[in-house]
């Protein structure tokens, strides 16, 4: 029997071959056959390190506290054993009850977990039912969903606590409880909700805590929910050449926009890119700026409806969009709480010290009152894009605004180089000497960029990673400066506010009024795009085209694709002007008169 070939035309190893080599396979983990079919349908070849370690322990009934890097397959590590135990229980007793509660910090992550459950249960969908409580539906609809006692409930701590208090969510038969992204849950302000859930939960529930870092927040949750858990600190060995290549550029505030223009217009980055900015207004300012050069992008922020945000991520993963501009408000607003002094042995000293430094800086930032009270729209507390969300095949993470902590930086760059792939992280840093030199493009968080960069370099060095300087040929870049200036002046504060209001109105209409229509007509959803033009105050069509004299000689062919224009099949001996002259001369000789039917027509009758 012929074996399938991978992208490098190398035969894919079979499970028998991997088992012979001592590698764990999904079949060797003892999972249900129907789940193995669902795994095969997802084209998973072999379990990752966290999956091979956590799944057997979960099947044994042990509590688990696992730390593994982003993109290492933590979701499947806790879902597969839970689904297996539900299927085995139903073979013995078909009684319907809620067996598993999965708590996540954001709506986007809840939707992702729900879709993962659906994919794994493709061959046992009738036996396992899951409900996502983070959808924007009325309380009556949520009660009706929970009335059937779904096997798995996915919710944020706030939704779970609310429904448990009203007895809509019954936890009496609960056997499994998972907190995904455990180090982020408390920073979203879910302390009281988690304590309430812990009081209502029956004793003896198996608990799994999944996190990318082990911090004091995780220790708090461990003391609240776990009973002598198995602590897994997993560091996967990266193959040579794989992982995230990290670069930094020190530049002025307006040069950020210049470099972004050059990067995308000259196609210096190939593939999909996520651009992180400091606040919502920066999202729209950057989008309006790029639009003037014909570069399309879509926006993710907490003011957009949740359905729109989820749809943007789905379409990005389907390669419909190449550029997402995402605001990371939680990090900028200093939502990382300062760790408590009592650190236990399980909390790593490096992470703990880094967290304390990051939290101090974040608190300094929040203490300073803003000079202007800006009228802001309603933000979604349960929004989060730099953590947990599985963006697929991201080539580059661009930190347009540097985060305020090394922890935030780690999770941002974790959106690329997932599941053994390679990726690039490029960060713009404002030196203190250049801070506030260009006020229209300045942002408050850039004041401490150099301090944060020093912490990032130190933190990455402890992991054996290097943050390298990225050198642009500024002589060639400066040739684009006047075009950047024209575009930047067109993006005024009024244009930003108008664009923000316009897009939020459009997205609300798409999200609420058309939701049912798209459920009934899924083909129409293809035409719903989120990267349409918002139009700045002054449209300058000439900026969309880069003249040849600005293009570098070496890279011109790569940008134009070697296009030399139209080439005719026949040689043209005369040009347009000479042809016109010849025609005019012919008219002068009388040929023009003969060709005029009014002068040559004769009405004589035939004899």
Swiss-Prot record:
ATP binds at residues 68-75. InterPro entries: DEAD/DEAH_box_helicase_dom, DEAD_box_RNA_helicase, Helicase_ATP-bd, Helicase_C-like, P-loop_NTPase, RNA_helicase_DEAD_Q_motif. It comes from the Eukaryota. Residues 332-380, 580-607 are annotated as: Disordered. It is found in: Nucleus, Nucleolus. Residues 55-232 form the Helicase ATP-binding domain. Residues 580-592 have a biased composition (Basic residues). GO terms for molecular function: ATP binding; ATP hydrolysis activity; RNA binding; RNA helicase activity. Its EC number is 3.6.4.13. Keywords: ATP-binding, Helicase, Hydrolase, Nucleotide-binding, Nucleus, Ribosome biogenesis, RNA-binding, rRNA processing. Signal peptide: none annotated. GO terms for biological process: rRNA processing. Belongs to the DEAD box helicase family. DDX56/DBP9 subfamily. ATP-binding RNA helicase involved in the biogenesis of 60S ribosomal subunits and is required for the normal formation of 25S and 5.8S rRNAs. This is ATP-dependent RNA helicase dbp9. It comes from Sclerotinia sclerotiorum (strain ATCC 18683 / 1980 / Ss-1) (White mold). The lineage of its organism: Eukaryota, Fungi, Dikarya, Ascomycota, Pezizomycotina. The gene is dbp9.
């Amino acid at each position: 029997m012929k074996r399938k070939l991978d992208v490098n035309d190398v035969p894919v190893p079979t499970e028998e071959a991997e088992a012979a080599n001592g590698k764990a396979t999904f079949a060797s983990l003892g999972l249900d056959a129907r789940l193995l079919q669902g795994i095969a349908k997802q084209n998973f070849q072999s379990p990752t390190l966290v999956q091979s370690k956590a799944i057997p322990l979960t099947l044994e009934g042990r509590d688990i506290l696992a730390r593994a890097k982003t993109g290492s397959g933590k979701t499947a590590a806790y879902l597969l054993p839970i689904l297996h135990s539900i299927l085995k229980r139903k073979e013995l007793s078909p009684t319907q009850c809620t067996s598993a509660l999965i708590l996540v910090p954001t709506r986007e992550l809840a939707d992702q977990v729900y879709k993962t459950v659906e994919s794994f249960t493709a061959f046992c969908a009738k036996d396992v039912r899951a409900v996502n409580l983070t959808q924007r539906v009325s309380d009556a609809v949520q009660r009706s969903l929970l009335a059937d006692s779904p096997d798995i409930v996915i919710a944020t701590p706030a939704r779970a606590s609310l429904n448990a208090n009203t007895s809509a969510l019954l936890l009496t038969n609960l056997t499994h409880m998972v907190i995904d992204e455990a180090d982020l849950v408390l920073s979203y302000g879910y302390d009281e909700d988690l304590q309430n859930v812990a009081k209502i939960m029956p004793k003896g529930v198996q608990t799994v805590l999944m996190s990318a870092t082990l911090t004091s927040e995780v220790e708090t949750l461990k003391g609240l929910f776990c009973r002598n858990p198995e602590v897994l600190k997993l560091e996967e060995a990266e193959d040579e050449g794989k992982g995230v290549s990290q670069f930094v550029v020190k530049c002025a505030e307006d040069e950020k926009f210049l470099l972004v223009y050059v990067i995308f217009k000259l196609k210096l980055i190939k593939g999909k890119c996520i651009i992180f900015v400091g606040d919502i207004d920066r999202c729209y300012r950057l989008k309006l700026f790029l639009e003037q050069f014909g570069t399309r992008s879509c926006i993710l922020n907490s003011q957009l409806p949740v359905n729109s945000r989820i749809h943007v991520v789905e379409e990005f993963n389907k390669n419909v969009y190449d550029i997402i501009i995402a605001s990371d408000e939680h990090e900028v607003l200093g939502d990382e709480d300062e760790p408590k002094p009592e650190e236990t042995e399980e909390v790593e000293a490096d992470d703990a010290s880094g967290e304390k430094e990051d939290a101090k800086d974040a608190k300094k930032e929040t203490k300073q009152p803003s000079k202007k009270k800006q009228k802001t729209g309603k933000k979604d507390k349960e929004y989060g894009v730099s953590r947990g969300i599985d963006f697929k095949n991201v080539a580059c993470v661009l930190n347009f605004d540097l985060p305020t902590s090394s922890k935030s930086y780690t999770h941002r760059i974790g959106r690329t180089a997932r599941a053994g792939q390679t990726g690039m992280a490029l960060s713009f840093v404002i030196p203190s000497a250049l801070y506030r030199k260009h006020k229209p493009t300045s942002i408050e968080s850039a004041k401490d960029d150099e301090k944060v960069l020093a912490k990032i370099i130190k933190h990455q060095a402890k992991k054996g990673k290097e943050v390298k300087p990225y050198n642009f040929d500024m002589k060639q870049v400066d040739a684009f400066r006047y075009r950047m200036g024209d575009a930047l002046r067109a993006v005024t504060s009024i244009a930003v506010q108008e664009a923000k209001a316009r897009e939020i109105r459009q997205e609300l209409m798409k999200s609420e009024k058309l939701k049912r229509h798209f459920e009934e007509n899924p083909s129409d959803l293809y035409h719903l795009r989120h990267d349409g033009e918002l139009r700045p105050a002054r449209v300058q069509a000439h900026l969309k085209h880069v003249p040849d004299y600005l293009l570098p000689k070496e890279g011109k062919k790569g940008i134009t694709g070697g296009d030399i224009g139209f080439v005719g099949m026949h040689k043209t001996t005369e040009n347009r002007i000479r042809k016109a002259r010849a025609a005019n001369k012919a008219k002068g000789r009388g040929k023009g008169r003969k060709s005029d039917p009014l002068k040559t027509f004769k009405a004589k009758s035939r004899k």
